[in-house]
Swiss-Prot record:
Pfam families: HCS_D2, HMGL-like
InterPro entries listed in its UniProt record: AIPM/Hcit_synth_CS, Aldolase_TIM, LeuA/HCS_post-cat, NifV/FrbC, PYR_CT
Function text: This protein is a Fe-Mo-cofactor biosynthetic component.
Gene assigned in the entry: nifV2
Record protein name field: Homocitrate synthase 2
Species of origin: Nostoc sp. (strain PCC 7120 / SAG 25.82 / UTEX 2576)
Pyruvate carboxyltransferase domain segment(s): 4-255
Superkingdom as given in the UniProt entry: Bacteria
PANTHER family, sorted: HOMOCITRATE SYNTHASE, ISOPROPYLMALATE_HOMOCITRATE_CITRAMALATE SYNTHASE FAMILY PROTEIN
A GO molecular function held by the record: homocitrate synthase activity
Biological process terms in GO annotation: biosynthetic process; carboxylic acid metabolic process; nitrogen fixation
Amino acid sequence: MNKVLINDTTLRDGEQAAGVAFSVEEKIAIAKFLDAIGVHEIEVGIPAMGKAEQEAIANIVKLDLSANLLGWNRAVIADIQASIACGLQRVHISIPVSAIQIAVKFHGQWQVVLQKLHDSISFAVDQGLFVSIGGEDSSRAEESFLLDVVLAAQEWGASRFRFCDTVGILDPFTTHAKVKQLVASLTIPVEMHTHNDFGLATANALAGTKAGALSVNTTVNGLGERAGNAALEEVVMALKHLYHHDLGIDTRRLLEISQLVASASGHPVPPWKAIVGENTFAHESGIHAHGVLQNPQTYEPFAPEEVGRERRLVVGKHSGRHLLSSILQQHDIILNHEETQFVLDAVRQESVEKKRSLTDQELLHLVQTKQHFRAC
């Protein structure tokens, strides 16, 4: 596999999630963190939105980060001028390429689409900018028309094409076939932009890289429009462990940036969230916990420390005597077989009542209570 780059769009598509609104300070903090962990490119926002967005972007540009910075634009010269005014040297130009999008936005006049694309690319290239082109709704576009558009964009000076599964309707097999055809026909690299409407954003992004795409759009925690985007932490760790492709990103800080974005967005990370969720390395059931105590690889695909997490062994409804005894021994409590079973029955009952596993403090309190009860 050729080197794949991450172009994170948390500050653009991530913030477009309903109800999310980053402050200037939060956007700067997120950009600095993405850069610090080694993300290659950051889509910093939409300059044409207005003064507040432009202020945030201009301040990020002034940080002189190692990551390349990209502004999102429509195929409108005024948009590109706004990007230039912010100090950006790389622009992304989005244009609809499916029949339904062109019908709604350009009354079906595909010639207008091509003209606007030509004019905007030409202007940006004349200004010495790196130009990325995005085919909005590429996944539903007629394939021959899509190829014609991208070949034209390539001829006019575009440096990259973003294949957008805008409404998240692809599966990995179809994604691979479509992207492979594009890669074979182009000399410029293809970038993947996938949405999670059917829970396949990360899978489709990976399929695109297998087909030859050299860049992937991600967002931290999968934040984004509707069901979200391909999650940065998922794409990075999947490429590392499933495809043995290390991107040079400091994965040990993935939990930190996840928590930063969760706080800034006002959307907590679900416990079962892949890679960074609280339960990702938590073990309760007896069989699993026993295996992990013997060898963590029995029930963990990689070490929790790789993403900044720690392994947690917790007691609850599904726990067994071995796990319970192991946790109690860590607190210098040793029970005989009968006592252990007595406490385990109580743990299971309380777990059902609380609808969760028990904390260590709750377990110790329960042991003290039950021992006192039996002594009476």
